[in-house]
């Protein structure tokens, strides 16, 4: 019998949530996703030192201003890592816009344009890139404009139905609803443990998936942020699942037989009027978990971006 990972691949597109080339070679995902935390982690890998050196040298040629050099080196490094990953996956790479721009639509769009340009200069067509943006109102509005330009987006840090609905209404290519971080919040808030079927993160993604299919939205649902393989197995059949190396390994070593749990419905429900900004903000604000986890996620990505920039600044000074 095929291992659990191979079975899962027959129902769901598997994406590697890592910047680690060796892990990607091992598990042969369709796509890969990165974020500031994963780029920081990848930057510690000795095999990537040449990519960092290239980013530093390139940044020095762009500007004499140290702050601009740091910004350029950071973007170039993310793209360099993405280019290497694209040599190994047949699909797409997700590269994230600086989390500190999460509440600035125009600067998010400008950063997306810069990342796409850097990929194109490295010989990568925009059809192989997803621009990752936080699922704030501003991030969703930025994605709407980028999608209209033909730049596909991955809306991340998504914890609530209101965020998912707004993304679909904006015509976003793909969303990354988080599973494990939702579970973390509820375990801390209630003091309870949850089995996979009743896991609040699994329930959330299932609701979003069913809503999208019932309403005929084309936005891809890619479950993200997993704590255990039970969550993953309960979401078999989801459009895509992005999974970290440790859980990919666990799935590859498992012989558990699985069946699809998420199945697209054939009934189409009439689409409601799109959420206004005021409606979105009110509905989102009513979800204490989503408010907490979005804010925390943005802060933590910004912290790791800052750590990466400290490392790059030291190298730029040499």
Curated annotation (Swiss-Prot):
Q: Which Pfam families match?
A: TAL_FSA
Disulphide bridges in this chain?
none
Tell me which GO cellular component terms the UniProt record holds: cytosol
Keywords, sorted A to Z: Cytoplasm, Pentose shunt, Schiff base, Transferase
Q: Pathway listed for it?
A: Carbohydrate degradation; pentose phosphate pathway; D-glyceraldehyde 3-phosphate and beta-D-fructose 6-phosphate from D-ribose 5-phosphate and D-xylulose 5-phosphate (non-oxidative stage): step 2/3
Residue ranges crossing the lipid bilayer per the database entry: none
Q: What does this protein do?
A: Transaldolase is important for the balance of metabolites in the pentose-phosphate pathway.
Q: Which HAMAP family match?
A: Transaldolase_1
The identity of this protein, by name, is Transaldolase
Native source species = Shewanella oneidensis (strain ATCC 700550 / JCM 31522 / CIP 106686 / LMG 19005 / NCIMB 14063 / MR-1)
Point out the gene that encodes the protein: tal
């Amino acid at each position: 019998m095929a291992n659990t990972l191979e079975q899962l691949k027959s129902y769901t597109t598997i994406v590697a949530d890592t910047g680690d080339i060796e892990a990607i070679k091992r598990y042969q995902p369709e796509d890969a996703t990165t974020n500031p935390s994963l780029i920081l982690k990848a930057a510690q890998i000795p095999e990537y030192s040449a990519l960092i050196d290239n980013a530093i040298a390139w940044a020095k040629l762009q500007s004499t201003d140290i702050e601009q050099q740091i910004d350029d080196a950071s973007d170039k490094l993310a793209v360099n890592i993405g280019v290497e990953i694209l040599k190994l996956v047949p699909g797409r790479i997700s590269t994230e816009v600086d989390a500190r721009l999460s509440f600035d639509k125009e600067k998010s769009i400008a950063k997306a344009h810069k990342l796409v340009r850097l990929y194109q200069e490295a010989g990568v067509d925009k059809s192989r890139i997803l621009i990752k943006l936080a699922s704030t109102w501003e991030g969703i509005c930025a994605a709407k404009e980028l999608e209209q330009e033909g730049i596909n987006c991955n809306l991340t840090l998504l914890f609530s139905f209101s965020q998912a609905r707004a993304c679909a209404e904006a015509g976003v290519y793909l969303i990354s609803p988080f599973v494990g971080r939702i579970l973390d919040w509820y375990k801390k808030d209630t003091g309870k443990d949850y089995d996979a079927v009743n896991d609040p993160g699994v329930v959330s993604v299932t609701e979003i998936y069913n809503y999208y299919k019932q309403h005929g939205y084309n936005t891809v649902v890619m479950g993200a942020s997993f704590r255990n393989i039970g969550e993953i197995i309960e979401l078999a059949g989801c459009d895509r699942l992005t999974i970290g190396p440790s859980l990919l390994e666990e799935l590859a070593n498992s012989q558990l037989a699985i069946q699809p749990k998420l199945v697209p419905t054939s009934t189409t429900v009439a689409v409601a009027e799109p959420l206004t900004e005021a409606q979105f903000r009110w509905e989102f604000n009513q979800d204490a978990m989503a408010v907490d986890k979005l804010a925390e996620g943005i802060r933590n990505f910004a912290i790791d971006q800052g750590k990466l920039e400290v490392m790059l600044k030291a190298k730029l000074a040499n």
